[in-house]
């Protein structure tokens, strides 16, 4: 086992005096691999000043600077997860997306019972980000991985709590076709890119379904119902259900017209696989699975 030397008060004072300069600040945290510095630095307030997003040009997105201190926390988590947890819980949230992604990485490196204590801090982030910045910082990708991590560690309630917000779909409007009576079209969008959404559904949700069972399936049903409602009302007024045209078969088939990046189609496949898993592992009988889906009014279900 590796051993570390705790810093003396004089060493801490010397570092505090030196890291007022940006380059030395970065150099110290990039080179420091000693977890025994965590609490002395925290006691001096070093982790209380994360950088805020900076709006350089009002025509573009804010800049979210990398924070060397939070990268240090990520590296130290495996050595002292409790100390890192205490520090992160005391840190102010400035809205800096690089820092938020670092906190997700911290949680991914923690035992599930420790990481679960950060979930209440993370869930509100999903309601704030926009598509452009979110995709760049991959916050949803990290949270998807955290859903799977928590589920594997037995923290299914925390995993479900993230998944409920992570998988939410909504409508976005685009201009209607020229000359059409429909002024705009509505389509289904996720809180992240459709590619990332598909990755979460195929990589992380199956783990959640395996460990959490029916509650995970109900999340998928709810979001698929929302997606179908958006599709059926895409022209501004209710339309017939055409799912038998764009998704005629439940299994992958060339007859299916929807694209792989279509959120509604992704949800159909994810729900199909989730229900199949519960039937295979004996959680649901085939009859119970059929009744679960048939009680919903949407033809696609």
Features from the language model and the residues they span:
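Non-catalytic all-alpha helical scaffold/repeat segments
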Residues: 1-301
């Amino acid at each position: 086992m590796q051993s570390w030397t705790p810093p003396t008060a004089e060493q801490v004072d010397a570092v505090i005096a030196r890291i007022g300069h940006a380059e030395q600040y970065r150099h110290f945290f990039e080179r420091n691999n000693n977890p025994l510095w965590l609490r002395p630095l925290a006691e001096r307030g070093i982790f209380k000043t994360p950088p805020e997003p900076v709006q350089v040009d009002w025509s573009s997105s804010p800049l979210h600077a990398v924070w060397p201190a939070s990268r240090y926390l990520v590296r130290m988590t495996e050595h002292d997860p409790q100390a890192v947890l205490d520090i992160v819980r005391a840190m102010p949230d400035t809205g800096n997306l690089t820092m938020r992604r670092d906190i997700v990485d911290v949680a991914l490196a923690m035992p599930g019972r420790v990481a679960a204590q950060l979930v209440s801090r993370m869930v509100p982030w999903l309601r704030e980000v926009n598509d452009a910045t979110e995709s760049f910082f991959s916050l949803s990708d990290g949270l998807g991985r955290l859903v799977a991590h928590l589920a594997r560690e037995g923290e299914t309630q925390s995993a479900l709590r993230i998944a409920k917000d992570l998988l939410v779909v909504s409508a976005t409007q685009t201009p209607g076709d020229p000359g059409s009576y429909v002024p705009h079209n509505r389509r289904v969008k996720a809180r992240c890119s459709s590619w990332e959404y598909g990755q979460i559904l195929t990589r992380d949700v199956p783990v959640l379904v395996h460990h959490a069972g029916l509650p995970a399936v109900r999340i998928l049903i709810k979001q698929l119902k929302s997606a179908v409602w958006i599709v059926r009302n895409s022209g501004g007024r209710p339309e017939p259900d055409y799912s038998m045209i764009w998704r005629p078969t439940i299994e992958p088939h060339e007859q299916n017209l929807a694209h792989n990046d279509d959120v509604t189609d992704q949800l159909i496949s994810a729900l199909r696989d989730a229900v199949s898993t519960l039937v295979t592992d004996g959680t649901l009988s085939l009859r119970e699975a059929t009744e679960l889906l048939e009680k919903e009014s949407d033809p696609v279900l």
